[in-house]
């Protein structure tokens, strides 16, 4: 997977490649789809959500420019797969999931795999997690109609937010960097994610 799906498509951060290469993706998937664990595609999990394709997890993780010392906020825990990757790359991770069943399952799995630096919380991810802000990096694993000010406001100086922005089935992956209070926006690649539901996202699934 690392050589043919990630490195061959331009992922060059060795720490990101190592993190994905060591992580058993099948453990984050339903039993009936584990045979597809190393296919480079998103796959359904519970609650109408998906586990992101390995390439997209790698691309988003690389875009965060993590060195190992950062405090990271993830919006949309899902299966916990991306949170585990981030746990290998950063000092600490808070991951927010709006579906209690998914949050509880992911938290238990992450604990069983030894990710003591990853904490899963239940809540509206579009609000961020202000009590632990600011964050060096924030990543959103669902598509937003616009960049929530509630999230950019929780970035530390120099902090990066990586988020898909756009309408259903037509989004642009963006990186927003807090440069001393000024927000620098960069386009990374077109993408398609499930909708980001919440007070500062979509109100209902598209």
Language-model segments: residues:
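Conserved nucleotide-cofactor-binding alpha/beta core module
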Residues: 65-184
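Class I SAM-dependent transferase core
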Residues: 1-77, 81-84, 89, 102-119, ...
């Amino acid at each position: 997977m690392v050589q043919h799906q990630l490195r061959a498509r331009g992922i060059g951060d060795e720490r990101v490649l190592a993190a994905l290469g060591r992580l058993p993706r099948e453990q984050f998937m339903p039993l009936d789809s584990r045979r597809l664990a190393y296919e480079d595609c998103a796959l359904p999990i519970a609650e109408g959500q998906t586990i992101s394709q390995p390439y997209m997890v790698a691309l988003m993780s690389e875009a965060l420019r993590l060195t190992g010392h950062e405090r990271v906020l993830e919006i949309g825990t899902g299966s916990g797969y991306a949170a585990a990757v981030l746990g290998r790359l950063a000092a600490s991770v808070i991951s927010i999931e709006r579906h209690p069943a998914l949050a509880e399952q992911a938290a238990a799995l992450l604990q069983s795999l030894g990710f003591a630096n990853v904490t899963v919380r239940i809540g509206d991810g579009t609000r961020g997690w202000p009590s632990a802000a600011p964050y060096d990096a924030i990543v959103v694993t669902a598509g937003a109609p616009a960049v929530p000010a509630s999230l950019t406001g929780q970035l530390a100086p120099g902090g990066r937010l990586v988020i898909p922005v756009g309408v259903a089935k037509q989004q642009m992956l963006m990186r927003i960097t807090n440069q001393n209070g000024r927000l620098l926006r960069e386009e990374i690649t077109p993408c398609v994610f499930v909708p980001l539901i919440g007070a500062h996202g979509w109100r209902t699934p598209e």
